[in-house]
């Protein structure tokens, strides 16, 4: 990736014992389809976990259960030691603590870029308007779209819109950021500008769960790669270990199909 320093991929491969997100024996069905099967996953504060796997493996569903966009049938999920609330104001607070960046940006089309980034601060965090605007402008500068603040989303490129979506999530001061295939809807030339922002967040210590097909990002930014197939976690390893010496046949098969060089 241009402009991004690539490490050996290990970083702090052994994160601290301070678990921020814990999924324990989580199961989820869509009708007869068992999309998450006995999932156990612990994510430490400051850890970057990249979830990869073939289509239909349950990656996005796993990501969406962490802020209860998808409910689970059994098992438990805790954030910072507390179980996920089911509904109401507590759920709104949880979602403020868990930033979510979607494939499709999900910006409000009728609000300016600045208003999009201010909205959650005003409505959920009850931040003073002047302070919310100051923070929003600083975050837009940070992700490289400060000059676009007064435009509407439709006036921006896909890459710019996704960077606004990242700024909007950061504006809430989240404890963890979830990225559900954040670059898969982008034109190829826009992918790097989003990955560079994500790489910067990772280097600054943001706790991140990233569902992606971008193997370069997984190699350079992840502390841990989680490989899923058929609703199960098949393998977990540091990027170096996973890409150079995958243990499972399923992972070997997956990598042989996507790594063309």
Task: Describe the function of each predicted region.
Residues 1-27, 261:
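ABC-family P-loop ATPase nucleotide-binding domain
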Residues 16-239:
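ABC family nucleotide-binding domain
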Residues 2-5, 229, 236, 240-261:
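C-terminal boundary and immediately downstream tail of ABC-type ATPase nucleotide-binding domains
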């Amino acid at each position: 990736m241009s402009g991004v320093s690539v490490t050996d991929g290990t970083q702090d491969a052994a994160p601290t014992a301070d678990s921020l997100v814990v999924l324990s024996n989580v199961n989820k069905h869509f009708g007869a389809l068992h999309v998450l099967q006995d999932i156990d996953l612990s994510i430490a504060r400051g850890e970057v976990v990249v979830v990869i796997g073939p289509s239909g493996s349950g990656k996005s569903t796993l990501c969406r259960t962490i802020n209860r966009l998808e409910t689970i049938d059994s098992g438990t999920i805790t954030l910072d030691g507390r179980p996920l609330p089911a509904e109401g104001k507590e759920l709104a607070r949880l979602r403020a603590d868990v930033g979510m960046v979607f494939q499709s940006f999900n910006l409000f089309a009728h609000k300016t870029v600045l208003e999009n980034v201010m909205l959650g601060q005003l409505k959920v965090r009850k931040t003073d308007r002047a302070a919310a605007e100051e923070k929003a402008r600083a975050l837009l500068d940070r992700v490289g779209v400060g000059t676009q603040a007064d435009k509407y989303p439709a006036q921006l490129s896909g890459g710019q819109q996704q960077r606004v979506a990242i700024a909007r999530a950061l504006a809430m001061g989240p404890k963890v950021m979830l990225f559900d295939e954040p670059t898969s809807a982008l034109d190829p030339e826009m992918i790097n500008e989003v990955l560079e922002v994500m790489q910067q967040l990772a280097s600054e210590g943001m706790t991140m769960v990233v569902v992606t097909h971008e193997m370069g990002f997984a190699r350079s930014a992840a502390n841990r790669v989680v490989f899923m197939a058929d609703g199960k976690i098949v393998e977990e390893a540091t990027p170096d270990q996973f890409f150079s010496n995958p243990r499972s046949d399923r992972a070997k098969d997956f990598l042989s199909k996507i790594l063309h060089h």
